[in-house]
A protein has these predicted regions:
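Intrinsically disordered, low-complexity linker and terminal regions at domain boundaries
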Residues: 254-294
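Electropositive polyanion-binding surfaces
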Residues: 1-261, 286, 292
Length: 294
């Protein structure tokens, strides 16, 4: 796993090894604890084998050739890169001005630079949000974040339909030993265009439902913690206050402007910060705070 991972890193692959929150459920389905997700070398070993298999199958089907459904990930757009520069450069993280020079290695360097620092999680979250959403497509356009020319989802056919589509294409080639006839290939390509779009849309809906369910479970759990204090960091600065993320729980909330009672704060949108009129105290993205849940 270590060798495979470093082979990917050498070619420019981007690794988001972000810890997440695991919801521990009781017998009645209620959340009894929120703990940090455990990721060890066994998880990484399986992940590397899955990535290697996905790449190998995508490459094979492309060069057979046999129509298939690919997993594609495009470059970040200009607006998101500019937003990322505006936030990270004042913190000492450099992003080339020429967007064409911003490859996944640039983002990996930023993540590595932030490792072990107070803003590590915040910086990784920002870099992740700057990326485009990966999609399914009938054409192989490569995977930007993985620095892979060929990529498909192949390893989970029992729970993900695109993987089943890829399995069927591979099994058909193994059985026949030749690519499909031109007319059949053209018909399948047309079907894959529509199927890929639907799979991408269904994936977005499923992820949205999952996030909503987790947020609700966290809300119910935290409603019993009102009055307790938590470590948090600033995830967004707006004209009416600070959006914060509770560390360890990874739940988001708002610290409204009127809760900052020590001064009158003005919002500076270019620098994405709040500045105290009398004290000069500054609240900016990534700042760590201790907050009380109300």
């Amino acid at each position: 796993a270590f060798a495979l991972r470093w082979m990917r890193r050498d070619r420019g692959s981007l690794d988001f090894d972000l810890p997440d929150a695991d919801l521990v459920l009781g017998e009645k389905g209620d959340v009894v604890a929120i703990v940090k997700e455990v990721r060890n070398e066994a998880h990484r070993l399986i992940e590397e084998f899955m990535l290697a298999a996905n790449e190998a199958v995508a490459r094979h089907l492309l060069f057979v050739p046999s129509p298939a459904m690919y997993r594609v990930h495009d470059r970040p757009d200009e607006r998101k890169l500019n937003d990322l520069r505006a936030v990270l450069e004042p913190l000492g993280y450099d992003i080339p001005e020429d967007d064409e020079l911003v490859g996944p290695t640039v983002f990996q360097k930023i993540i590595d630079q932030a490792e072990g620092k107070p803003e590590e999680r915040f910086v990784s979250d920002l870099v992740l949000r700057a990326q485009k959403k990966a999609l399914y497509a009938a054409e192989c356009r490569g995977h930007y974040a993985l620095a892979a020319k060929y990529y498909a989802h192949f390893t989970s056919p029992i729970r993900r339909y695109p993987d089943l589509v890829v399995h069927r294409a591979l099994c058909e080639w193994i059985a026949s030993g030749r690519p499909p006839a031109a007319a059949e290939a053209e018909s399948r390509e047309r079907w894959l265009v529509d199927a890929s779009a639907q799979c991408s849309e269904r994936e977005r809906r499923a992820e949205s439902a999952e996030r909503e369910a987790q947020s609700w479970k966290k809300f119910v759990f935290l409603s019993k913690k009102v009055g307790e204090e938590f470590e948090a960091y600033v995830s967004a600065v707006v004209s009416f206050g600070l959006f914060i993320t509770l560390e360890g729980v990874y739940a988001d909330g708002l610290l409204p402007m009127d809760a900052l009672e020590d001064d009158y704060y003005r919002y500076e949108d270019v620098e994405h910060r709040l500045v105290g009129a009398s004290t000069g105290r500054v609240y900016r993205l990534g700042d760590h705070l201790r907050v009380k849940l109300t």
